[in-house]
Amino acid sequence: MHLLDMRKILTFSLPLVIIFGGIILFAYRGTWGKTDIEFRIHINEQLVLESAFGESPTFAIWLEDPSTGSKKTVFVTRRAAVGDWEGKAEVPVALPQWFEVYKIENETKNLPNFEKPASLAVTGATPKPGYFITRARVDPGGKWICWIEVNLSGDYNEYYQQYNQVTKIEDKYGTGQPALLYRAKFEAVEGAVITPDIFGMCVPDSTDGNLIQPLKSITTATHIFDEISIAIVKPLPKIIDTQR
């Protein structure tokens, strides 16, 4: 190969190498000094099929800083995020605890709606039954409380009926069993795997307050998520960083 040809190859290749190296550095830039919290949830297909409406559950995930009490949403299904309740103006019983988080984050007294929805960055389509995975990026070693709230519409049982013949009370929102709240406290140390525990059931304006402990008359709702885990993992390099 002639020296002139070698120079041409180098002249052409060097900028490509520099560009490629720059892309790699840029992709890793957002991971330096960070760690990811990975949420892995399995939605029980059988319970979804057996529910009155056959729709996947509405749920939200958020993190709380135990030192300040501040909260930030990691993920919320679209129906709750925008208030899309198919003809109903509001369904305050869907995710009562997360709605309070939304109000603080958005400085409002109202529930999410089309005019003022939850942030697009944390909103996602309602996952189909099966595995759902999402991540949040945080500083290593930080202490957190994770909250997960879930409701499967129309998962009626003998205690929570569509229409109670004795009390003559109708479930006007189609809620079924009340939303359940899961909780986990952990430190963001890579390699840790945490399993959240059920913390209570969420019933707005009840005599016991919005959060009721222990569970009352709950049956199948505890199996809507038949697997939940929180893992502290290395961040994935990305050219476009979508982590929250």
Predicted regions and their residues:
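Short, Lys/Arg-rich N-terminal segment immediately upstream of the first membrane anchor
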Residues: M1-R7
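Hydrophobic membrane-insertion alpha-helices, especially the h-region
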Residues: I9-Y28
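Ser/Thr/Pro/Gly-rich low-complexity linker/stalk segments immediately outside membranes or between
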Residues: A27-R40
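Short amphipathic, basic-aromatic surface patches that mediate peripheral association
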Residues: I37-G54, R79, Y156
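Short beta-strand/loop motifs in extracellular/secreted proteins, especially
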Residues: P57-F59, K72
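Beta-strand signatures of extracellular beta-sandwich domains
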Residues: A60-E64
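Structured domain cores in non-transmembrane regions
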Residues: P66-N157
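Glycine-rich, aromatic-bearing surface loops/beta-hairpins
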Residues: T134-R244
